[in-house]
From Swiss-Prot:
This is Dynactin subunit 5. PANTHER family: DYNACTIN SUBUNIT 5. Residues 179-198 are annotated as: Disordered. Belongs to the dynactin subunits 5/6 family. Dynactin subunit 5 subfamily. Gene3D superfamilies: Hexapeptide repeat proteins. It is found in: Cytoplasm, Cytoskeleton.
């Protein structure tokens, strides 16, 4: 699947050795507890609360603008306990979401402005429609489509959704490119060699 290139200012992103692209205007709290497994995109305004518990985000996953990734919590003997949060491979999270799920499987699509409440479990290959609010402790089965406020089951999804999501997130990653003179419609000029004298 091919998507239109989307260009970003290279100076505004950090690119790691394993291909993660992290916006400098995102906030990664407790960075030692945050693991990005490669070719993951963290866009501007994203907040990842690794200071509360460990957060693992799989390969070729995309966290869109102004989304909050926050580990689940539960009161235990009068105090709030936070649990590690796992997000699988090929997951696309839309803009303006709050994600407090205990776990999200692979090949999952979450639309814009969704709230995935505490301790929710999203299995592989599911879709959460825009503006959906999943109540706490919701379990979304694989190959299902949920929407609404509160979010409820709407229909089953075909088996091909797995391959579609893999191809879609891969294309989004590959088309997320740093700005160049050519991408801005400017003529490219050869770089002049600079020499120094000692």
């Amino acid at each position: 699947m091919q998507v239109q290139p989307k260009y970003f200012e290279k100076s505004q992103y950090i690119e790691t050795l394993n291909g993660n692209k992290v916006s400098k205007s995102s906030i990664l709290c407790g960075i030692m507890n945050i693991r990005l497994h490669g070719k993951t995109i963290i866009k501007p305004g994203v907040i990842v609360r690794g200071d509360l518990a460990s957060v693992n985000i799989g390969r070729l996953s995309i966290i869109s603008e102004n989304t909050v990734i926050r580990p689940s919590s539960k009161k235990f003997k009068g105090s709030l306990v936070y649990f590690p949060q796992n997000i699988g491979d090929h997951v696309l999270v839309g803009e303006g979401c709050v994600i407090s799920a205990a776990s999200i499987g692979s090949n999952v699509y979450i639309g814009n402005n969704c709230i995935i409440s505490k301790r929710c479990i999203l299995k592989d290959c599911c879709i959460i429609a825009d503006n959906t609010i999943l109540p706490p402790d919701t379990v979304v089965p694989p190959f299902t489509y949920y929407s609404g406020t509160p979010g409820v089951y709407k229909e089953d999804l075909p088996d091909c959704i797995e391959q579609f999501q893999k191809e879609y997130t891969t294309s989004l990653y590959e088309s997320f490119l740093p700005n160049t003179p050519a991408s801005k419609g400017l003529p490219s000029t050869p770089t002049k060699l600079q020499t120094t004298t000692t």
